[in-house]
């Protein structure tokens, strides 16, 4: 199997994973228009090639919240990562730490905070949802701090779960879902042994630690469905600040007015994100939303972006549009599913190589030199 780009990992992951898991990661909301536009809008952005600039010295490193990153990339929070490889959160975190970038742990990870944090030699980030069960939120924050987490990623674009039609077709949800998942596992023996058997326990570790009992996939779906909180407002985030005094990033911003509100609230950063096209179909792609948001709040807080990033070239595009750092989700998850920690390591090396080529050929010797002047054409131009 030849792996030369993240798209190769996607194809290999589709062969290796049971369909319910592949499509859970790969799918989006409703008819998946936004999911597709996340990728196509980035691809339509033309870079400005510059030559003869003596690019013998090049630096991809950047600073973010008193951390030095080897490149402006972090691994995004992805629920159920531990179902894609044996103890997947640990493997992904180790690959990220070895490359000198942050790993963001999802609230709904398979491995608990206490298993992942000691496995790496740099602080990880922790992602938290807005939930009705404030006791769980408080418990998660306390455990994150105790584990040495410095940065909180607070996801605000899930007051209700998105309508993901693919999940019903694949067996992730819907009629006879449990039976279909078992049958699919039986026809994917490599995954069934490595993850299904050797990757146990299949609890949602952070939730099980709080509830005091094993929480499997069916419980995960039911518990989350009952705990999303549509009543959340900016005032509720003040409650979070009572329990978290470190850097806080608000994830799920697509509008400049919301970005300005994040500044007023005192957020340290935002993630320009449509949840990978998994929440509301028909909203702007992150690439389309980013320039106006950067114009509104650049310099007032750190701007991160995700959704649709499939290569180091896409990272350069997002930085040129106004991001300080990007998050990658599906790309690392596919690599993890195929080759575990080694796959994520290789993917990050591919991203770095692609970034270096793009920077050399656009004349940017450092991340700070990647600006809108690096673009020939922005979206809609």
Swiss-Prot record:
Chief place where the protein resides: membrane
GO molecular function list: FMN binding; L-lactate dehydrogenase activity
Domain of life: Bacteria
Enzyme class: oxidoreductase
Binding site for substrate: 24, 129, 164, 278
Gene3D superfamilies (UniProt xref): Aldolase class I
Subcellular location per the Swiss-Prot or TrEMBL entry: Cell inner membrane
Active site: 275
Membrane topology (UniProt): Peripheral membrane protein
PANTHER family: L-LACTATE DEHYDROGENASE, S -2-HYDROXY-ACID OXIDASE-RELATED
Listed name of the protein: L-lactate dehydrogenase
